[in-house]
């Protein structure tokens, strides 16, 4: 199935001291007549492969396909956009109207909002706390003003642990957010780092939903000449952080088994590297996982944005059952209709598509039912 590949996350031409814009150093957003919210991909990179055609509309959507829940939908509160500009970055083009239009085009009834990278951390504790609060309140207001159209994954000011614990309480108890949105790494620290244990212990106590989104890792930039880091490293950073939870010294995956993780992009490279995870346990012989790492990753959830090609689905479904898959778009960086087309092209049954499109999301977050 041919798709038009939009560009990747725009950012600075060089990394900041605090890695605030660790998502792409290769390009700036441009306006395309068909959809000004899409980003320009590296020029000519995929044209030679015959993958340059525009995404076609989903034809003859069924009733179930008109009630999708999108769990990977970014928004940009004005205060976040201002902070990005202040620190030398550029926010993606976003508006409430453009979000709703993209949702309607692809039959998305409800989108769960999460901040566009890099979130709220720019190196200053007080700024991070203030931004997290302001962005979360903005998202909660969008949800209130548009009944049934939005959910919310609240932002935290990590790596500020104390501020994050306060924001968890406010976001979940006061704002009634549907879950928490985190990034795969913060500077040199991945989610399994010991520094983040207090945050995950609190999330575990609450049996919280935790949606994760990759960033461009501090360790790996410009490894392939002319290829933006997010083309490769986003998927790999997801796998790194899952490994940190399972194999890290803190043992977060074992200490906090009730955190309900959603991993972006069909798990990144995890489905293709699971054999290496298995081998790691053969060597380690960790008594906490006598059956290896597979039971751990099988209980996690995976959304399908930029992870809906046939080969990606096939690999992911060798690892987890359909009950662990969720619909996601990665808007505004990609259109929801792209994921919808990918889902329809794969030989899922109607019941399986209904599970991915809506039912699993409602099972995990019943508040999205309205």
Which residues fall in each region the model found?
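Histidine-centered divalent metal-coordination motifs
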Residues: 72-74, 213, 265
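Generic enzyme active-site microenvironment
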Residues: 211, 263, 328
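Active-site gating/metal-coordination segments in enzymes
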Residues: 113-242, 248
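Aromatic-lined glycan-binding groove of carbohydrate-active enzymes
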Residues: 249, 259-293
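Acidic-and-aromatic substrate-binding clefts and catalytic sites of carbohydrate-active enzymes
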Residues: 92-93, 121, 158-164, 187-194, ...
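Mid-to-C-terminal alpha-helical segments outside catalytic/metal-binding sites
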Residues: 2-36, 40-54, 62-67, 71, ...
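Active-site gating loops and adjacent loop-to-helix segments of metal-dependent hydrolytic enzymes
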Residues: 15-28, 74-94, 123-124, 129, ...
